[in-house]
Amino acid sequence: AQHLYRDKLLKDPYRPLYHYVIPEGMAHPFDPNGAFYWKGRYHLFYIIQTVRPKPFYRGDAWAHISSHDLIHWKVHPTALKPTDDTPERAIYSGNIFLNKQGIPTIMYQGLGAGNSIATSVGDDWLEYWDRHPDNPVIPYAEYPFDNDQAEYRTILDKLPDYGAYDIWDPHCWLEGDTYYTITGNNELWPGKDALFKSKNLKDWELMGDFFHHDPIEGTLDCPDFFRLGDKYVLLFLRNGLEYVIGDFKDEQFHPEKRGTMTWNIGAGYAPESMVDDQGRRIMWAALNDSRTSWGDVDNFITKHAWAGTLTLPRVLSLDEDNDLKIEPIDELEGLRYDPVIIKNLDVNGEVVLENIRGTSMELRMSVNPRKAKSFGIKVCASGDGKEETVLSYSPEENEFTFDLSKSSINEEYMEGYLWEKDKIQKAELTLERNENLDLRIFIDRSVIEVFVNKKLALVQRIYPVDEDSDQVILFSNGGSVQVPILESWKLHPSNPY
């Protein structure tokens, strides 16, 4: 059976080659967690679905991978999973930090129990974790899974403090000699993102609202909170990948700026980041596979044998105005081969790049688009125009557009996570007076990831059907655009299979 599953996933034309993918099996959700640099290796954990040990147990657990270069990954044994001896029914999101003794420590959401702690002592590979004997250190009620939301709310309303916080995707860090934990809200208590503090990781005090003002409305999923330069940054999932930049003072977060990476969820969700030995803040997010849904897990695995993809690692930094900069890691350049360079290209209307085509490649160019009403590039385009994914910029509207309306003639695949209003997604992008439009585009079978002027990092899943849907086309409307240089590379696969 294992061989048959492996054969299926190897034949899947939509399985990415250099974006990390689960070796096999189910990861839906595929939330990355516990990103941590330790003993010369990058460690990353993510949620997978395993065999359910008891009725009402989802079987969610933390898988574990590590790498020396952020590109090639070693698979480790499953790190945390629910068992007969643990109170939780599933292991949900959390993070890793160093405790006061310098020991790698996990705080995670244990479904049905609460926020819990585990530590890894004397293990360079971070494969062995000891749960805290007093787990859950921040408990919540154990409730029957067949209750509807109204009954669930009735149960929790009877508990102390349960109008003040909920257990949801904790994030813990050490500030000075004090541990702090965000435990996000859910839809029962919008705007209630609670902050706890502790001196010993066992006894926690509820401090109240995490936000000093302008709280996030609705759920605050997968929060990731860290210092960046002179500011603090909160990454989270709401209507897509979002972030808030501000200050943490007087034990509250004071928001100043808010931005978006993806819109209406789309492909990207569940941000997670770490700091490496070079001081880089490196971030990942999970990518939905829209060919499946929450209610179709078993059928999907039977058909495709896998589900779970991550974005490319991204480096986050702040510019002189404390605006967020986002760019791909330099290590990706080591995958390049078979370069093609085109110079001094005049684009007026459409120009098909005959010697650049493919479904696993990188494209890079810098242009001045101001003489046209819009300038862009079509990738994974078919010769008959029935399939194409369009990336374009309008100087007049100061908008960058990601148009997925013709990405696949298979509407069933595209409808998995997109609605009609989301198929053309627009992001605000204002170029300075002498600033060019700088594009880095990564195509990886069913993934398109676009970095624009280090200001935008957009990602989507596409599922072209036509074997001819590998063309690259430049275009301009309402004027001519000069392309001084366009570079392309094919990229070596980095996944073992």
Predicted features by range, described:
Residues 3-6, 249-266, 272-497:
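Beta-rich accessory regions
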